Curated annotation (Swiss-Prot):
GO terms for biological process: 'de novo' IMP biosynthetic process; cobalamin biosynthetic process. It comes from Parasynechococcus marenigrum (strain WH8102). This is Phosphoribosylaminoimidazole-succinocarboxamide synthase. The gene is purC. Its EC number is 6.3.2.6. SUPFAM superfamilies: SAICAR synthase-like (SSF56104). GO terms for molecular function: ATP binding; phosphoribosylaminoimidazolesuccinocarboxamide synthase activity. NCBIfam families: purC. It catalyses: 5-amino-1-(5-phospho-D-ribosyl)imidazole-4-carboxylate + L-aspartate + ATP = (2S)-2-[5-amino-1-(5-phospho-beta-D-ribosyl)imidazole-4-carboxamido]succinate + ADP + phosphate + 2 H(+).
Amino acid sequence: MSPDHGELLYEGKAKRIYATDHPDQVLVEYKNDATAFNAQKKAQLADKGRLNCQISARLFELLEGQGVPSHYLGLAGDTWMLVQRVEVIPLEVVLRNIATGSLCRQTPIAEGTPINPALLDLYYKDDDLGDPLLTEARVRLLGLVDDARQSAIEQLARRINGVLQPFFDGLELQLVDFKLELGLNKAGELLLADEISPDTCRFWDQRSSDTNDRILDKDRFRKDLGGVMEAYGEVLKRVHTACPNPRNCL
């Protein structure tokens, strides 16, 4: 059941954003759409929206308890979330704790190599350009953020990793890497936005030694491994044990 909402403001690959009666708040609906390779691969996965919404809500509240500001205000249904309206900064911030994926394709670093301190990469958020990797000089050239804002973004991202990595270790999940999106609210405050879920994180199950069976994230969809929703459900099950009762705005 959907909450009362205003007009559709934006629809992306994984979420819809709707207006509310409050000009500084919007409702986010998590969709069942699955995409990979910049939407070249697509599918509908039943229950994906609910799982990602419920995981994200619990992790936003975990981070909030550790002083990390986010756009999250509370749940508004199984697949709905009330959030602050933010102006999204067109940078994707990726933290890498363990080498895998594009890092191993682009460098001679072996998959599974621990990275400490975590590698922080910045990507230009532009689907038409394929979200290219940026250098600091290119960030300045594009005028996306000034040096002070970039420093604040990187500090916040590392704080988030500093909370999430030991949290997931306690759940016997390795936080391999993850993507963050950040934005500015009406007051100009830098906030964590978007979501934190198996769509945006790589999780490896520490209870499994099999390189495919241990994958509990979107790589199961990318690699046609099957069991995608079972993997997402396992992540929610473990997160729920530590964060059982997220706020409800209804």
